[in-house]
Amino acid sequence: MSTMDCSTNTNARKINVIYVRFLSKERRSVKLLNYRFTRDMTQSREVLAMMDTHTTTFGRKRGCTVSPCGAFLFGAAFLVSLVVTGLLVYHLAPCLEDKLVKSCNNFGNSVFEGRGLFNKDTYGKKKLDVRLPSSVVPDSYELGLIPFIQVGNFTFHGEVRILVNVTEDARNVTLHAADMHIDESFTNIREYSNASVKADRIIKITEQRNDTERQFYVIRTSDTLKSGRQYMVHLKFVGHLNDNLQGFYRSSYTVGSQTRWIAASQFQPTDARRAFPCFDEPALKATFKISIARPKNMTSISNMRRIGEPMPVPGLPTYVWDHYERSVPMSTYLVAFIVSDFEMLKSEFGHFRVWARSDAIEQARYTLDIGPRILEYYEDYFKIKFPLPKMDTVALPDFSAGAMENWGLITCRETAMLYQEGVSTSSNQQRVATVISHELAHQWFGNLVTPSWWSDLWLNEGFASYMEYIGVNAVEPTWKVLEQFVVHDLHNVFGLDALESSHQISIEVEHPDEISEIFDRISYEKAASIIRMMDHFLTNEVFKQGLTNYLNGKAYKSAEQNDLWDALTKQAHNDKVLDPKITVKQIMDTWTLQTGFPVITVIRDYNTGSVTLTQERFMLRNGTTVTTSSVEPLWWVPVTYTTESQLDFNATQPSQWMKAEKSITLSNLNWVPSEWVIFNIQETGYYRVNYDRKNWQLIIKQLNKESFRNISTINRAQLIDDALNLARAGRLDYAIALDVTSYLAHETEYLPWKAAFTAMHYLDSMLIKMPSYDKFRVYVLKLLDNVYKQVGFKDSPRDPQLTVFTRIDVLTWACNFGHEDCVQNAVRQFYNWRNTPSPDKNNPISPNLKMVVYCTAIRFGGQIEWDFAWQRYLETNVGSEKDLLLHALGCTRETWLLSRYLDWMITENSGIRKQDAGRVLNSIASNPIGQPLAFNFLRNKWDRLRKYFGTSLLIMNNIVKSATRGINTKYDLKDLLEFTNEHIGEFGSATRSMQQSIEQAEANIRWVEANRVTIQDWLKRNTA
């Protein structure tokens, strides 16, 4: 799934079923259907929760009266109590915060206890054993679904036959089911026999029970289900097409004034159980034969090809059945089906198809162009043919994640699949390419070979996140995406992984909330980074052949990381790349089973020519390495380096290993004392590098020469990122780190500037409320002066991709800091657009300049500019344009507009889709004026947010992250801790995000105390 994603129930007696969305307390339409409920379901907590509060009535009750004198005495007593309460609060309140902070007298020096708020034992539900019994496992499914896609009846009826294998004697069949009613009068189990002469024996059922906490449906039998035999389990059920973007859900779009509805599925990680009863664990693969009933004027698609002609649905004259071929063995989370009125385009040979709204289908042509080529490239790369007969990709109006790799049926949000030339930006185009490449890589990593359990999610997402760059590079080589990996993925995840609240790549998870939590940058970007590291230290040929062996050996099965290690080790030993005594498991377990990453400190002996390398976990807590672990983590570190004389920035195979050793010394290196040395060539290793002061000074001297390009572009980016983050963590003097950045006045390449902007964004967010901020602004503008002149405010279609990206970032920072020419250009271009006849059809702003122009004009404008942009958002048919406008609307400095925007974000039919709420809040929280508004909104509207989005969605994760970032005062931290303490246990899949936000806020406060004066003094000296 590309990222880095409530429930319903029913209640009735005998023949009536009333559908109500029970997690929302807003009144919903109800629909009576002919069906019967089980007694178990009518008494469940979910049913009690959906009682309609609007039916409560009030009447006059018996009471008492109070005399005027009594009322006076009562009032006097009340006033006295207020005074006493006020005195108590005055004297006692300051130390009430002891619950949150150990010391209320010395807050700035206190030991923060935010980490203590989060304990696994806090969540009773997470203690539950939510794994299915292993005694009964699925072999095959036959699934039929009839979705009713109409206002007032968003339901679906279903029937499933599951052929199960019994691996040990059992007296029950336990499977998953959630948010649906199962008709227990219809349920039956038969012993299955292939012999046509022998009738299948019926197994007597003694009890059927919904275990709602575990999301289990348990069928108990009087007879023992015998090991080694097969049984057919037959179930009928009714569910609700929800609007929470999970399970089998509904989505809509408008054509003119008409709203059109579709039904789509999103099952990863644990939501197939919301669409049909199933064994919803990734290792429990089975084949699926799917039938979908649909209105005659709509189309259905699923994982496999449709077979035969549509068949009538008895009793539903406007519906027909579509039957699909039986699938290959696959996990439940990869099952998919869609019913829509979309249009389709197909490739030359017809096996690759793209689907979208009829007025957006032409925007899918870029996907249709690159998709088949990337698929073919992967077939050659892995030496394994794509195993399905077709591939569909579908652009959905509402989708929680970026995209989903369903086998043979990739689903995407529109911005991840659609590209409109002349409207969409180069960045949009690259996003489409990387998302499609990512999801196609999953067809092998995740689909063909699936992790045995979600603990090894990284085997899916890490490989897809790395392979996406390789796939895009094959079809768009001029973009240099392999170089971009360092600044887009590696540097991006370093910040998260430097927190104590980070987690191992391979981590034990059980509860669905825990599973959802790890769909994060660790499972995606860190995993991709260590895979890239393997690719380099094993060599590309060994790496590729090892992957092919792994995929062939585990095809249509599930795997654990040890299976991958074994395949790579065998190939590495065969090709003599690794010492026979060393295994990939020895090396890589230190990266997947330990949290964090090391900083390698390089101390040179300039007299002897030797160098000592020391490793220590890198953390952002001002140089401390205190962790919850009693054992200091050590890694197998591949060591690469070059010197000023050698200038070899291509040799990425390690010349030396740190074999989980605290330190090593390299001797007889023949280094010239007056020359610099740089470690971690092309930053292929997942670690930071610090140097002794003299080597840093030698590097700075080189960077300030005309020959600064002697250091490779990637390593220039590395030096900037390492220096500023080492200083942030208290491991390097900020004067040295900022001296490293001074050469940027002559830099024009994208990678170093991107690294600088990423690292300086933190400085910007910390300094913005301080007196020294103006000096920081002046310094950055001085650095930008040359590159601003180089890239200019004019976009050219002939510019290389990295030049375009450099221009976008440079103009964004220049305009943000009030660069006069930049602001004037942006405001003028926006003004011209406003005065253009038919602005929805004629936008004179170059696509790649839109983000800068929109945001700057709205920031320096008022309601007129905001309302104009909002109207353009409502009118545009291009998803990427909507995305740009949503972000730009958060740039305003008008507080009331931001407050209204926040409210619209959680208002039905406001025009903002649920999937885009994170985008809105992120934009507002990125605005210095909007950040406190965003956090207050999170605090004050928490219950409303939970009702609107639910706690298990990726959306809530994004909202929590955005609203709580940038906190750097003890008072704001106190508010954050109070909010967290008040709602502990309610964060669901956002629990880890909240924990990380608290830790980051604590680190920010320490940073301000430790570095404010040093940075202020340096800026004074360098901006005079």
Residue map of PLM features:
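Hydrophobic alpha-helical and helix-loop surface patches within well-folded domains
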Residues: F22, I262, Y324, H351-V626, ...
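Surface-exposed beta-strand/loop patches in extracellular or lumenal glycoproteins
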Residues: N165-H181, K289-P295, R621-T640
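Beta-strand-rich binding/interaction modules
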Residues: D183-R190, I301, K581-K585, T595-N680
